[in-house]
């Protein structure tokens, strides 16, 4: 769960290679993240460095919604997930799947 741009910055810093982040490169393990067994560490590094690492924060609090534009605008962020049930609770709306208009009002 991400609530602020500062939290997101710390996540991006650890998930993305320089110059955007400071993720270290492990040439012996990183290539195994590839679905193509022919890829070596050089191919993986180039793909990951060029935006091939998905960084997807989960927004599931009222604070996260309040700060979502700043969170999602950060370089290195590639999308997001919404945690609807925890978000409902954070907004003071009882749990369940009904009443989306209640959540939108909050």
Question: Where on the chain are the PLM-derived regions?
Answer:
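Expand to "…catalyze enediolate/carbanion chemistry for C-C bond making/breaking, isomerization
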Residues: 1-106
């Amino acid at each position: 769960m991400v609530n602020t741009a500062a939290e997101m910055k710390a996540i991006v810093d650890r998930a993305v290679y320089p110059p955007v982040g400071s993720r270290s490169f492990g040439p012996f393990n990183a290539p195994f993240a590839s679905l193509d067994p022919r890829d070596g560490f050089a191919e993986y590094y180039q793909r990951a460095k060029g935006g091939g690492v998905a960084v997807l924060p989960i927004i599931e609090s009222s604070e996260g919604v309040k700060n979502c534009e700043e969170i999602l605008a950060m370089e290195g962020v590639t999308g997001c997930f919404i945690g609807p049930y925890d978000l409902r609770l954070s907004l003071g709306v009882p749990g369940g799947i009904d009443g989306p208009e209640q959540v939108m009002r909050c």
